[in-house]
C-alpha cells in the first residue's frame, strides 16, 4: 500500500463540482463544492465552459485538502466521476477549448436525430451501441460541433483536436495534457462505442462523420491512466487511477455488485440502473444497455440496464430560479408538506423532453389539473410527485426487460434527502426504499475505483462492508390510490 493514506474523489456534476477526500475505511475526512455557470444561448441549448469546470475542480481540490487538514502529498490516488455525454473539443497541444461544451441536456440536434431515424438506422444503432438515437448522447453533439465550428473537422482529421466527455477533459488537465483517455462506462454513452468489442465502432463513426484521430483511448474503470503534473495543490506523480460516469459510479458506490441489484440516483436528472452481469441485456421497453464498469485493463466487464430521466432536481431548481416560489431548493419539502396532497395537480417534468422509456425530445413540461383552488404548495407537491412517477415508469420497464422484480429500491443523490419525495416514491413503487448514510455514492464509487486502480484495495468487498442504510421508507399508499395516481400520470404524459 502507498505511504499516503487518502483517496481524492473528483465528482464533476452538471451544476457544480464536488471533491471528497476519503480514508482507507471509506470515511469522508474533507469535502468541498463549487457551482459553475450554466449557459443557455438559445431555447433548448445548454452549454458549459470547460475552463470554468477545470477552475472549479482546482478550487475544490484546494478547499477539500484544507477542510481535511491535509497536504497534497497525503493523497495516494485520484478517482473521477462525471456528468456523462457532455461533449467538448480542445486543441491537443495547448488544451485550448474550441468552444463551450455541449451539455447532455442540450436538444439542438433533435432535427439531426429525426433525420437519422427516418433513414432507418436506429435498430442498427441499438444493436451496436445499446443506445437510441437521441440528442442526449455525445455522437450527434460531436457531429454538430464539426459542422458548425470553423476548421474543427480539418484540425481533428490531422490529429490536432481532442474530443472528450468530461472525464477525458479532467484526466487531460490533471496529467498536464499527457493522457487522452476515457473509460468504458463513459465511452458507452457516446453512440460511438461497440458494446461487444468495447472499442470505437468504425460503422458508427462513419455514420456520424467523426474523425478517428480525435477519439480518446478507451480504458478500464480502475487502472492508472497517468499521474498528476503541474497542479496548484497536488504534487506531481499522484496516480489518476479510476473513473466512471456518474451513474455507473453510484451503482458501484451502492455496492450493487450482483446481477439484479439496482439503484436510483436523484440529481439534476434521475437515473435508475440495474446490474445485469457480464452479458449485455438488450432492451425492448425503451431502456438503455450500457457498460457499468470494467475493473482493470483486461478484467471482466459488468453491464447494466439504465432508465434515464432528464429532469429531477432540475425541476426543483426551476421552481427556485424560474418561478421563484422558493428561496432554497430544500425549501420545497416544507412547502409541499403544507398541503395533504397535490389537489389533483399533475406535473410532467419534461423540461428537456422526455427520456426513457418514452424518448420524446419534442415533449415539454406540463402542469395538468390546475383550477382556482390550486396553490403554489399544490404545484410544489406535484413537482415532487412527478419526479417519483417518472421513476415508476422506468422501474416497470426494467422489470419487463430484466425479468426481475426490484425487491428493495436503493436511492441516493442530493434529492434523496427529501423525505416526502422518498416516501411517495416507495408508495408508487409499492416496495421498500432504502436511503444510505452517505448520499454522495457517486463520490464513494469514484474514490473506490481510484483506490482499486492504485492498489490501495484489492477487491470491491470493502465497499460492501462500508455501505450502511440510514432510513427505510415502507410503502403506505393503498393499491387503489396508487392506481389513481398512475392513471392521472399516464394521461398527463400523453398530453406533454
UniProtKB/Swiss-Prot annotation:
Record-listed ATP binding positions: 14-15, 268, 313, 317, 414
Keywords, sorted A to Z: ATP-binding, Glycerol metabolism, Kinase, Nucleotide-binding, Transferase
Top-rank taxon, per record: Bacteria
Record has Metal-binding as a keyword: no
CDD domains: FGGY_EcGK_like (cd07786)
Cellular component aspect of the GO annotation: cytosol
Enzyme class: transferase
Binding site for glycerol: 84-85, 136, 246-247
EC nos: 2.7.1.30
Residues reported to bind sn-glycerol 3-phosphate: 14, 84-85, 136, 246
GO molecular function: ATP binding; glycerol kinase activity
Signal peptide positions on this chain: none
Cross-referenced Gene3D superfamilies: 3.30.420.40
Family matches, as InterPro entries: ATPase_NBD, Carb_kinase_FGGY, Carb_kinase_FGGY_CS, FGGY_C, FGGY_N, Glycerol_kin
Regulation: Inhibited by fructose 1,6-bisphosphate (FBP).
Pathway terms, separated by semicolons: Polyol metabolism; glycerol degradation via glycerol kinase pathway; sn-glycerol 3-phosphate from glycerol: step 1/1
GO biological process: glycerol catabolic process; glycerol metabolic process; glycerol-3-phosphate metabolic process
Annotated catalysed reactions: glycerol + ATP = sn-glycerol 3-phosphate + ADP + H(+)
Entry similarity comment: Belongs to the FGGY kinase family.
Primary role: Key enzyme in the regulation of glycerol uptake and metabolism. Catalyzes the phosphorylation of glycerol to yield sn-glycerol 3-phosphate.
The protein's name in its UniProt record: Glycerol kinase
Amino acid at each position: 500500500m502507498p505511504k499516503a493514506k487518502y483517496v481524492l474523489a473528483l465528482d464533476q456534476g452538471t451544476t457544480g463540482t464536488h471533491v471528497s477526500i476519503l480514508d482507507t475505511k471509506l470515511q469522508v475526512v474533507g469535502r468541498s463544492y463549487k457551482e459553475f455557470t450554466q449557459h443557455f444561448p438559445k431555447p433548448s441549448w445548454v452549454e458549459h465552459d470547460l475552463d470554468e469546470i477545470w477552475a472549479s475542480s482546482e478550487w475544490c481540490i484546494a478547499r477539500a485538502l484544507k477542510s481535511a487538514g491535509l497536504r497534497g502529498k497525503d493523497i495516494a490516488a485520484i478517482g473521477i466521476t462525471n456528468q456523462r455525454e457532455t461533449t467538448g473539443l480542445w486543441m491537443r497541444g495547448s488544451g485550448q477549448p474550441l468552444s463551450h461544451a455541449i451539455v447532455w441536456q442540450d436538444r439542438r440536434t433533435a432535427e439531426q436525430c429525426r433525420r437519422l431515424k427516418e433513414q432507418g438506422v436506429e435498430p442498427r444503432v441499438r444493436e451496436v451501441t445499446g443506445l437510441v438515437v437521441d440528442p442526449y448522447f455525445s455522437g450527434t453533439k460531436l457531429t454538430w460541433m464539426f459542422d458548425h465550428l470553423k476548421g474543427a473537422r480539418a484540425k481533428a482529421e490531422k490529429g490536432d483536436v481532442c474530443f472528450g466527455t468530461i472525464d477525458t477533459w479532467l484526466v487531460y488537465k490533471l496529467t498536464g495534457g499527457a493522457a487522452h483517455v476515457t473509460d468504458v462506462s463513459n465511452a458507452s454513452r457516446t453512440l460511438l462505442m461497440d458494446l461487444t468489442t468495447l472499442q470505437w465502432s468504425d460503422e458508427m463513426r462513419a455514420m456520424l462523420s467523426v474523425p478517428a484521430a480525435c477519439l480518446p483511448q478507451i480504458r478500464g474503470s480502475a487502472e492508472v491512466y497517468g499521474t498528476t503534473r503541474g497542479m496548484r495543490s497536488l504534487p506531481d506523480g499522484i496516480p489518476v487511477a479510476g473513473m466512471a460516469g456518474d451513474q455507473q459510479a453510484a451503482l458501484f458506490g451502492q455496492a450493487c455488485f450482483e446481477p439484479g441489484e439496482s439503484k436510483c440516483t436523484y440529481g439534476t436528472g434521475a437515473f435508475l440502473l440495474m446490474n445485469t452481469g457480464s452479458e449485455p441485456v438488450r432492451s425492448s421497453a425503451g431502456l438503455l444497455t450500457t457498460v457499468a464498469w470494467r475493473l482493470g485493463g483486461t478484467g471482466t466487464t459488468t453491464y447494466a440496464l439504465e432508465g434515464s430521466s432528464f429532469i429531477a432536481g432540475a425541476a426543483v431548481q426551476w421552481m427556485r430560479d424560474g418561478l421563484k416560489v422558493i428561496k432554497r431548493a430544500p425549501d420545497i419539502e416544507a412547502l409541499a408538506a403544507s398541503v395533504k396532497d397535490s389537489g389533483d395537480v399533475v406535473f410532467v417534468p419534461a423540461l428537456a423532453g422526455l427520456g426513457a422509456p418514452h424518448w420524446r425530445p419534442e415533449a415539454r413540461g406540463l402542469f395538468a389539473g390546475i383550477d382556482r383552488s390550486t396553490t403554489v404548495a399544490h404545484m410544489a407537491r406535484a413537482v415532487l410527485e412527478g419526479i417519483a412517477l417518472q421513476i415508476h415508469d422506468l422501474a416497470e420497464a426494467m422489470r419487463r426487460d430484466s425479468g426481475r422484480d426490484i425487491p428493495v429500491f436503493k436511492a441516493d443523490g442530493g434529492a434523496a434527502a427529501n423525505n416526502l419525495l422518498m416516501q411517495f416514491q416507495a408508495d408508487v413503487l409499492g416496495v421498500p426504499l432504502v436511503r444510505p448514510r452517505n448520499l454522495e455514492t457517486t463520490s464513494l464509487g469514484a474514490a473506490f475505483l481510484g483506490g482499486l486502480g492504485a492498489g490501495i484495495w484489492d477487491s470491491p468487498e470493502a465497499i460492501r462492508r462500508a455501505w450502511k442504510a440510514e432510513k427505510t421508507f415502507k410503502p403506505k399508499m393503498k393499491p387503489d390510490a396508487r392506481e389513481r395516481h398512475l392513471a392521472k400520470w399516464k394521461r398527463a404524459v400523453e398530453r406533454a
